[in-house]
Structures are given as C-alpha cells and as structure tokens.
Regions:
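Conserved C-terminal beta-signal and adjacent last beta-strands/turns
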Residues: 7-10, 196-200, 237-239, 424, ...
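Gram-negative outer-membrane beta-barrel transporters
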Residues: 174, 382-390, 487-489, 512-631, ...
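N-terminal Sec signal peptide and the immediately downstream disordered periplasmic leader
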Residues: 1-63, 70-73, 195-198, 238-242, ...
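Periplasmic-side early beta-strands and strand-to-turn transitions of outer-membrane beta-barrels
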Residues: 121, 166-278
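Extracytoplasmic beta-strand/coil segments of soluble accessory domains associated
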Residues: 69, 73-112
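N-terminal periplasmic accessory domains that precede
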Residues: 68-71, 89-92, 103-106, 125-128, ...
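Short acidic/polar hinge/loop motifs at secondary-structure boundaries
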Residues: 110-142
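Outer-membrane beta-barrel signature, preferentially recognizing the C-terminal barrel domain
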Residues: 264-290, 368-370, 419, 428-491, ...
Length: 701
C-alpha cells in the first residue's frame, strides 16, 4: 500500500469516527468582531469604514499556514497569483497587482521585497511574518487605504495582529508535515513556537517566537524550488502601570533557496541564480498609551534585508529601512479623531543596478535612497447616535523626489436596523516608483543581461480611486452575510519597455555590426513609463449560516473584471521620442491587469460532533486566467482551464493542552498545468500543489 492511500484511509477513519461521536457541550467562542486596521482604533466590523475581514488565530493554527497565501480562500476579493510559493507569487486584492498589497505587522510595514529586485523568491512580504502560534488575528482590508498607511496601500492592506496578553506564563508549539501525492511535487515540514514569559511581577514580560520551514524541491522544470526558512523573534515589554507600555523588539529571519539543474532548473539557467538566500534583521522600540480621552502608538523600526547568491560579488542586494510611526486617537463628544506623523527612509544597494555609462560598477554597487514625511488626520463623526457614522480623512505625503501628494477618503456607515448595516465610500491610494525607476543614471538588469532598463525622471506615481457600496446583515443568532460592489479607477500604471521595439536600441552605445540586439554581448536599452492605467470592478458576496448549533456553512464568491487602458504615451529614447503605438506593446490594451479569475467561489461545511472535534469539507472554484508578464517580456498568456478542488480535514483537542489535525487538500488532484503546453509562450501556468496531506501536532499551556 503506497503512502497516499494509507493516509487517505486514516483520514477517512478519523472523519467517520468524529461523525458518530456523542454530542456534548458545543459552545464555541466566536470572534467578537472588533478590528483596528480600518480606522486606527478598536471598533465593530459592521461600523468600520472599509470592507474588512478577520481571520482568528485559532483558524490559522488548525490549518496549513505557511505564509499569508494560506488565507486567500477565507476572504472574498483576495487571490494568490503565481502559485503558493512560486517565483512570481503574490497576493492580489480586488484584482490589483501584488506590489499594491501592503502587509503590516501590528500596524507596522513589512519591508522586504525591495531586496528582491529580480524576484526568484516569490512574495517576500507574505513570507517574512510571525508563525501562526504568535498571531491573535489577521485583518484584511479590501480597497486602498493610503489615507492612513501611505504609499503601497493601493489594492488593500493585510494587518497581522500579534498576541499581547503577557500577564501569565503561556506558550504554543506546533510540528507539521505536508506529504504531496502528486508526482514530481516536493514535501514540506514545519515547526513553530510561541512563548510568553512574565519576568518580574507586572513590570517586565518577554515574548519569544520562531519557526523552521523546509520544503523539498519539485522534480519538473519551473516547479517549486527547495527552501529552508527560519525565524527567531523577541519582544520585551515594560509596563510601569496600566496606562503605559513600552517595548523593545528584535528579529532575525533567514530564507535559503536553491534549484537543481535537471529538476526545477534547466541546463541553460545561469548557476548564479540557482542558489541564493535572504536574511532580514529587524530592531525596534515603541510605546503604547491608553488614557481616558487619548490613545498613543509610537514606534521606530529599523530593518535590513540582504540577498546573497552563489557568487556574492555578482548579485548581492541590500535594503535598509527606517520607519518612524506615530498615531494618536482622541475622543470628544460625537467625534473620534485620529492623527499622526510618519517618516520613512529606504536605502537600496544592488548590483542588479548598474551605471548608465558602462557595465562597470558590479563589484562596488552604489546605494540609492528615498525618504518620505507624512501627516494624516481622520475624523469619525457619529451623526446619529449608534446609527449614522461619517468618516473623513486625508494624508499629506512629501516625497523627496515627487513632492507633495494628498490622499483623501470619505466613508458613510448607516445602521438601518439592529441587523442591517449599509456602507459606502470613496478611498484613494498611491504608490511611488522605486528609486531605480526614476534616475536616468541607473539601469536595472533584465532578461539575464539582455536588457538594461534605465530610470525615467518624468515618471509619475501610480494612483487609484475606489468607489464601493455594501450591505452587511447579522441576525445576531445564526445568519450573517454581506454584499459589496466596487469599482477602482487605476491611473498612471508604471510599465517597462521589455519585449518591445525599444529594446533594439543598444544600452551602452554602438555594438559590433555582427552583434544581435538585444543579447548578452550587446544589451538592449529599456526604460519605464506611465500608461493610462486600468479599470477594475466587481462584486463580493459572503455568507455564514449556523445550520445547527454544531453545523456551519460559510461561503464567499467574487466576480472580478479588469481592463488595461494603455493610451498612446510618448517614450523618450536615445534615438528620440517614440509613441506607444510604435512599440509593439499594443497587445496589452484591454487585457486583465492581474492573473486573477473572473469568478471565484469558496464554500466550507464545518461540523463539530463534540466540543473537542472539528471536521470540515470545502469546495473551491476558479475560472480561467489571463496573465500579462509585466517586466518579463510583457507577454500575454492564457490558461483556459477552470479549476475545481475539494478539501477535507479533522482536528481533535485531545485535552486542554494537545491538538491533532489531519487535512487532505485537493482530494481529486486537479491542477491547471498541462505538460504538453508548458513550452508554449502563449500558455500561462505556474507551480501548483496537487493532492496533499497535512498533519500537525500542537501543544499549548
């Protein structure tokens, strides 16, 4: 009997046993619906001025949680693009690009992707996060939130809230393994821990957490690379009294990746790119104050992320980030006022960035920096007591390269009845270009030295304006649901000239007559420019029904449609102006902005035969995909295959300290990948996991 059949039999037995168990007290603690990300202070979800979803820490610990990608199925409007952990993976919110999803930990930015200018390790901001055992909940805001959080919050915000109850000794530890039954896909192992240690009365407390994640390499070209990820973090809390808390924080994370020629790498692949690692070090201090009419949250976080490769002298990359954040909330009468000041500075040094004059400078890369100052203010006005809330806010950002930018938003919440709330509003977002995209003296290597993209001093930040209206229903008993309609006008999208006629211009002056342009011997010239943008619109539905006291059905559906609008901008090249219509990039016009399905549906049936046992059965559907490879030739590729998968699992609280979980994902082993089409340049595919079994042992005290 092979291992997959054996595991399947064990899983079926566990589920069957739980279904016939004797029902006992089945009162389950439900999340109280309090969030902080939408406005900067605690409030009920139904009154929050944004479309927001919450995932509890308990959900994370009893499911396979390896990165933020694991939460996508739980939230409408959220999709993983490019596979769970592939080189082009990331989280898209409402059809926007992955780079426009802002990831926060306790309201503070995760700054990692800037050390990954060439990709290869996937979505770093979704991977450099605490383990599930250290997380209290995750809040997901769908729609731009630049008024509170600044640049990058164009598509939405994911805020990871860590545990902060350190009044008594407690801890969690979990060990899990993933066994893939699909041929050629590697297995995974993971260990996590969280410790809360009161040190001296109520004055000092220490929090420790960490993880170790291992994944075997796939055995097919372009599959998942081998990875080894580990983390160790510590936070010391100093609490002189009930109103004041101070913390000192330190964290070290390291992720190693490698590919093997003949497995996921081809013989043609440059060996330099086959082995590389990322190390992130973070340090910070902060203060939290809670008084009668004023709350304060002040922090300074410094982090450094460095990428090294098989040959460090060729392609190192280092990013240093300084972030000072201050936020104050005051309450007076019918108004809740939130205001603050933020400062950030980023230094990036990488030999993927070269001098405009020649190919020299690889051994001694120059460091480039960008800084921003921002002030923000937002007022929630309770016009009618517990009935009508109006939120007005704005953020003024000063960027050293782009000057001042104003990001306003307005949102209205009306509690029509005790069970029905109506919401609607307008929010704006913006994203400044990277340093290497705006300086003509800086070039970024593309296509393995075939193309060098130089900065454009006339580049404008990307901007978005989202309009949404929704209704939320909760009968306070057994039925909850929501519907939201949204439209996002995305302007000034930044595009590069890769895969166009522009690349036939030599990057470093005349080439020998026999040289092919572009090629390694004679790289082609490229640059960045703004196109008109894109329009994204859709509908989000979610429902949650307690069929019985121990039987629940939850589901969400998303319709998402997007169209790129290129316009006909002028590109300034070394040979003079060139209209967009001359570049051979008109193929992008009208295509989807991201590789997100037009239709996405998730449904989960959860049954608790006894208080200690929880079983589930889930179904997931995604329609066909269209992808534009921005920055990688700007190719348009399609995958016309729909995807329908099913999951099931069981978790058992053996006692108050020990929990066992066994899940089967993608039971019928369905993937989009078609090996016969893998080398077709018009065929879109990404690394996927087929049928797999996940087992976890978790202990808490």
């Amino acid at each position: 009997m092979n291992r997959s059949k054996f595991i399947a039999i064990c899983l079926s037995a566990c589920v069957a046993n739980s279904l016939y168990a004797v029902e006992k007290d089945n009162n389950e603690t439900k999340l109280d619906g309090v969030v902080v990300s939408a406005s900067g202070f605690s409030q009920q979800i139904k009154e929050a001025p944004a479309s927001i979803s919450v995932i509890s820490g308990d959900e994370l610990t009893k499911d396979s949680f390896t990165s933020l990608h694991s939460i996508a199925q739980k939230v409408p409007g959220v999709n993983v693009v490019g596979g769970e952990d592939g080189p082009a993976s990331g989280i898209s919110i409402r059809g926007m690009e992955k780079s426009q999803t802002l990831v926060l930990i306790d309201g503070k930015r995760v700054n990692s992707s800037s050390a990954n200018p060439k990709g290869g390790a996937g979505d770093m901001n979704s991977n450099f996060i605490p383990p599930a055992e250290a997380i209290e909940r995750i809040e997901v805001i769908r729609g731009p939130m630049s008024s509170l959080y600044g640049s990058d919050a164009v598509g939405g915000v994911i805020n990871i809230i860590t545990k902060k109850d350190f009044s008594k000794f407690s801890g969690n530890v979990g060990i899990s393994t993933t066994i893939n039954a699909h041929k050629g896909i590697g297995d995974g192992r993971q260990g996590d821990f969280y410790l809360n240690l009161p040190l001296y009365k109520d004055l000092f407390a220490l929090q420790l957490w960490g993880y170790k994640k291992l994944r075997d390499e796939d055995n097919y070209k372009g599959g998942y690379q081998k990875s080894d990820k580990r983390n160790l973090s510590a936070k010391l809390w100093i609490t002189p009294d009930e109103h004041n808390k101070f913390f000192i924080f330190g964290s070290n994370e390291k992720h190693d990746y490698s590919r093997t020629v003949g497995k996921t790498a081809t013989i043609k692949t440059n060996k330099v790119l086959n082995a590389y690692d990322y190390e992130k070090k973070s340090y910070g201090v902060g203060y939290l104050g809670e008084f009668d009419n004023l709350n304060a949250d002040i922090s300074y976080i410094y982090d450094q992320t460095q990428r090294t490769s098989l040959f460090d002298s060729l392609i190192p990359a280092k990013a240093k980030n300084h972030n000072f954040n201050s936020k104050f909330t005051t309450f007076f009468g019918a108004h809740t006022l939130t205001f603050g000041y933020d400062f950030s500075k980023q230094n990036v040094g990488t030999t993927f960035i070269v001098s405009n004059a020649s190919k020299n400078g690889l051994k001694d890369p120059k460091t480039y920096s960008m800084s921003e100052h921002a002030g923000f203010i937002e007022d929630e006005w309770q016009i009618l007591d517990e009935k009508l809330f109006l939120t007005l806010g704005s953020r003024l950002t000063h960027n050293e390269f782009f000057g001042n930018h104003l990001s306003p938003r307005a949102y209205l919440v009306y509690n029509a009845t005790d069970t029905l709330s109506l919401k609607g509003g307008v929010a704006t977002g913006y994203k400044t270009p990277d340093v290497n995209q705006i300086s003509p003296e800086v070039g970024t290597i593309q296509g393995g030295w075939r193309i060098v993209d130089f900065g454009n001093k006339d580049l404008k930040p990307e901007k978005s304006t989202t309009y949404e209206v929704g209704a939320y229903y909760d009968n306070q008993a057994d039925l909850r649901g929501s519907v939201t309609l949204f439209r996002n006008e995305f302007k000034d999208k930044i595009l590069d000239t890769d895969g166009s006629n522009v690349n036939k211009i030599p990057a470093f002056g005349p080439c020998p007559p026999s040289a092919k342009i572009p090629s390694v011997g004679c790289p082609g010239w490229g640059t960045y420019f703004n196109i008109e943008g894109a329009t994204v619109w859709g509908v989000e539905l979610s429902g949650d029904y307690d069929i019985l006291s121990n039987l629940n059905l939850s589901s969400n559906y998303t319709y998402n449609k997007s169209k790129i609008k290129t316009g006909n901008p002028t590109i300034n090249t070394p040979r003079g102006p060139m209209k967009f219509s001359e570049t051979d990039l008109a193929r992008l016009d009208g295509k989807s902005l991201t590789a997100t399905p037009e239709h996405t549906l998730h449904a989960t049936l959860t049954y608790k035969p006894v208080k200690s046992v929880k079983t589930f059965f889930g179904a997931n559907y995604e329609s066909k995909l269209t992808s534009v490879n921005f920055g990688a030739g700007n190719r348009v590729r399609e995958n016309t295959k729909d995807l329908l998968t099913f999951d099931t699992g069981v978790s058992w609280d053996a006692n108050k300290h020990l929990t066992l979980s066994l899940n089967a994902y993608n039971i019928f082993d369905k993937v989009r990948y078609d090996e016969a089409l893998a080398d077709d340049g018009n065929y879109y595919w990404y690394p996927q996991e087929g049928r797999r079994f996940w087992f976890k042992v978790a202990a808490k005290w």
